Amino acid sequence: MQNTDTTKYIIHSKINADGVIERPDIVGAIFGQTEGLLGADLDLRDLQKTGRIGRIEVMVTAKGGKTKGNIFVPSSLDKVETSILAASLETIDRVGPCSAKIEVFQVEDVRAVKRKKIIERAKLIFTKMFDETVPESQELADEVRQSVRVDELTYYGKSRIPCGPNVLNSDAIIILEGRADILNLLRYGIKNTICVGGTNIPPEVAELTKKKTVTAFTDGDRGGELIIRELLQVADIDYVARAPDGKCVEDLVQKEVIRALRRKVPVEQIIEKYGIQEREGEESTRVERGSKRKIRAPEIAPRITEKKLHKRIKIHRVSSKPDLYEEELPEEETKGKASAKAFEKVSVKAAEKVSEMVPATAGKVKTRSIVAKPQISARKAPAAARVSREKPAEKVPSAVKVSRGEAVRVSPAPVKTVPVSPEATRFRPHVEALKGTLTARILDSQDKVIEEIAVRDLASRLKTYKENIQSVVFDGVITQRLVDIASSNAIKNLIGVKIGNIAKVPADMEVLTASML
């Protein structure tokens, strides 16, 4: 008997006989007509006894005096021997008294079929059985972290508001929207958090904000903005942090959480942004509570006082000395104290080295005391000069030396006329005409327009140009590609709106922009 486990190939053949025949007739014809045909090594009887050939299966049907069917011969021989055996079956031309014809149409590789079944089954096992029984290592880690976060989650007050374990002991707390936000921040080690559960702020949270430095950390959507508005009305918060637009705090990763908290802004900026009116007495309370917010309170009062008492007017001097400022005192203070106080002496360069140009619309200048600002000597001060516009004046003499409040004045230096470059005379009319049109003009040696084309077609057109081109003016960016094409055409002038990333320019080419003309 043939062991089906060792079968390598199955020979599929079909038989057509002119007459009625049965299975024993076909099997007998196969053994009888192939006996001694292939030699002793490939004799079917010997091969079947040794198990190299399996049981021959025959399936036939007789209809209308003719018989049709299929013959299956299992083989454990190699490919060559199996092919010889299959070819020998086609030599059978008679079965019993009837003429017959056998034709082999397939040799099936049993091992290939088994491999396909193995692959399909392996896919099923991998997708279903592993997911159901064996969790991933990341799932195990997430499960452990989740259990730890749930254990650390505590509750505050009679309403059992979810919060972090350090919300009572910490000097600063973070107000979040919901329980999921607290769990996400606990995951990254932030434990001084408490949630409000929506826009209805619990009274316990509002009372807690009066004792601590509070940061409101909300989602980057409309709901987060509404929570901030509610907190500004019923609670006392110091800073506001927002998640990125369209994201929730519970979905942020550690890097996004840290970045959002570092970018928190003082509550005063949020009040100005949303245009919210503070409750009566709340603004004074914010300044008086120095113990709660030690950073912001000292900065507010000096800034307001300085802004009200002094107006700074910068004096431009052609000198390497630090910038000087004129501090304009109020008129009432000037009248009462101008004669009593002596002004400090400030060393200034000689009058012949100092000149100042003042716009023609400058007005009267009030009594000033010129004071050097040593704290800003290492950097440039703002160049904004404030002058009253009561009466137009053509020029105001500049102060050059100060002694006890008196200034020595010199007339301003004359304005120098800058000569117009020849390129400006030649190409400026073309630049003005092409501004905003996205077109280009190709000029000859006499600066006459040879052709006017679109900027997008300029590079391809210059490649095919054979006429004598001297200059190209166009409303676009000068690129390295255009420079190379212009150089190959011996173009001397290339004028555009601005210069892009250019690594090299030929020595005989002039590259200009509209601002250079």
From Swiss-Prot:
One of its GO terms (biological process) is DNA replication, synthesis of primer. Its EC number is 2.7.7.101. CDD domains: TOPRIM_primases (cd01029). Binds two Mg(2+) per subunit. Mg(2+) 1 binds at E177, D219. Forms a ternary complex with MCM helicase and DNA. Component of the archaeal exosome complex. HAMAP family: DNA_primase_DnaG_arc (MF_00007). RNA polymerase that catalyzes the synthesis of short RNA molecules used as primers for DNA polymerase during DNA replication. Also part of the exosome, which is a complex involved in RNA degradation. Acts as a poly(A)-binding protein that enhances the interaction between heteromeric, adenine-rich transcripts and the exosome. This is DNA primase DnaG.
